[in-house]
Every structure is written in C-alpha cells, then in structure tokens.
C-alpha cells in the first residue's frame, strides 16, 4: 500500500500595520480550531528580550542570539503590544540575520502542524510561499490610523490621531521599500480591502476563500 504525506494546510494573512489582519487571523483560527501565530510578535519579543537585559538595539549579533532562543509559545500579546516595544521592534526587524532566524522559526511552526494560521508582512512571499491559501488584507491609511487610535483609547491610554497616521505612513514606506522581504502581496494572494468592511464581513469573505481551498486540499 502506497503511503503519502499530506502537506500542512497553512492559512497566510499578510498586510500593512493596522489593516485588520490580526483580528481576522484570530477569528479564522478560532472558527477552524487552528493554531495561530502573529509573526509580528516575534520581532517584538526579540526587542523586549534586549530591552529587559539593557542591551543595545543596534547590535545584530545580540539580537540574533535573542531570536534564536525565542519561545514562540511563550509570547504574551498584551505585554508585547506596548508602544515602546513596537518602536524597538522596528529597529531589530531590519536586521537580515534576525529576519532569517525568525523566518526559520515561523516556518517550522507552520510545517510542524497539520494546519495553522499565520499573519504578518512576508508570510506568503517568504515564510510560507507554498501555503494553501494566501490573503493580503489592506485598508486606507486613514482607516488604519483610526483603528489604531481607537485601540489605544480602548486601553485607557492617550493618543494623537495625526501622529498615528504619520507613523503608519512612515512604517508603510519602510516596509514596502526595505531590501530584505519588502511588504507586497504574493502573486497568488487574494486581496481583501477592509476599508469599508466590518470584521464580520471580512471574516465571511475570507471564510468563503478558505472553505474552497480546504475542499481542494482534502481532495
């Protein structure tokens, strides 16, 4: 009897900051009972490890060591969501050696499981280019800034909308123009513009695509 290995069913959700990809990824993971990895947290976790030890953020060797020893299952989103950690993460995320180490860890996470949902910026193009289904979630900068602004207020913190919008545009430019793994949709990704969509509408649109991919995957 011929045996064969079924490839893991990987759902990829890429997109710029505050596009709604994380919210959508968590909803999809819950609906299908799939493990979820927010790959953006891996860069934040590396930055936090350096900050906690009082180490410089511009030392690629130290940052890479932190990346190689990272436990993906021990990341605390609530702690890692702090603004200061996000700022620090943007500095280590541009380091090629750090990116290579984290990409390998993210890839291992996806390939070691029967199914999973990963969201980030380069999952469909770099981490899991052979994923069964790829979504690229986007929205206008103004809509994304409003979402981020509302998130900050909901946490009880203060925020300046104009400052958030400027930061988002700056991050978009940095992400799209970086030499290593620039932010762009994979050629076979399904584009999902959530500028005028509710979370429920975005989920239903994604679910339709995923259900179709699942049916094909199962043959």
UniProtKB/Swiss-Prot annotation:
UniProt KW keywords: ATP-binding, Cytoplasm, Kinase, Nucleotide-binding, Transferase
Any one GO biological process: pyrimidine nucleotide metabolic process
Annotated compartments: Cytoplasm
Pfam families associated with the record: Cytidylate_kin
Keyword Kinase: yes
Enzyme class: transferase
InterPro entries: Cytidylate_kin, Cytidylate_kinase_dom, P-loop_NTPase
Entry GO MF terms: ATP binding; CMP kinase activity; dCMP kinase activity
CDD domains, sorted: CMPK
Catalytic reactions of this protein: CMP + ATP = CDP + ADP; dCMP + ATP = dCDP + ADP
One Gene Ontology cellular component: cytoplasm
EC identifiers of the protein: 2.7.4.25
Keyword flag rRNA processing: no
Binding site for ATP: 15-23
Gene3D superfamilies in the record: P-loop containing nucleotide triphosphate hydrolases
Protein family per UniProt: Belongs to the cytidylate kinase family. Type 1 subfamily.
Identification of the protein by name: Cytidylate kinase
Species annotation: Brucella melitensis biotype 1 (strain ATCC 23456 / CCUG 17765 / NCTC 10094 / 16M)
Gene: cmk
């Amino acid at each position: 009897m011929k045996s064969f290995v079924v490839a893991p069913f990987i759902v990829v959700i890429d997109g710029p900051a505050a596009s709604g990809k994380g919210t959508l990824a968590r909803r999809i993971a819950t609906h299908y009972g799939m493990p979820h990895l927010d790959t953006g947290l891996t860069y934040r976790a590396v930055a936090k490890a350096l900050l906690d030890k009082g180490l410089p953020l511009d030392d690629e060797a130290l940052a890479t060591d932190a990346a190689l020893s990272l436990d993906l299952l021990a990341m605390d989103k609530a702690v890692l969501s702090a603004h200061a950690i996000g700022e620090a993460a943007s500095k280590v995320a541009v380091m090629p050696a750090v990116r290579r180490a984290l990409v390998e860890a993210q890839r291992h996470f996806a390939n070691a499981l029967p199914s999973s949902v990963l969201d980030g910026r380069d999952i469909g193009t770099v981490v899991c280019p052979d994923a069964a289904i790829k979504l690229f979630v986007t929205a206008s900068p103004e809509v994304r800034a409003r979402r981020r602004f509302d998130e900050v207020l909901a946490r009880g913190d203060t925020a300046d909308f104009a400052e958030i919008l400027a930061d988002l545009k700056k991050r978009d430019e940095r992400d799209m123009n970086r030499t290593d793994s620039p932010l762009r949709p994979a050629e076979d990704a399904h584009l999902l513009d959530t500028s005028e969509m509710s979370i429920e509408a975005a989920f239903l649109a994604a679910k339709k695509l995923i259900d179709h991919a699942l049916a094909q995957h199962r043959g």
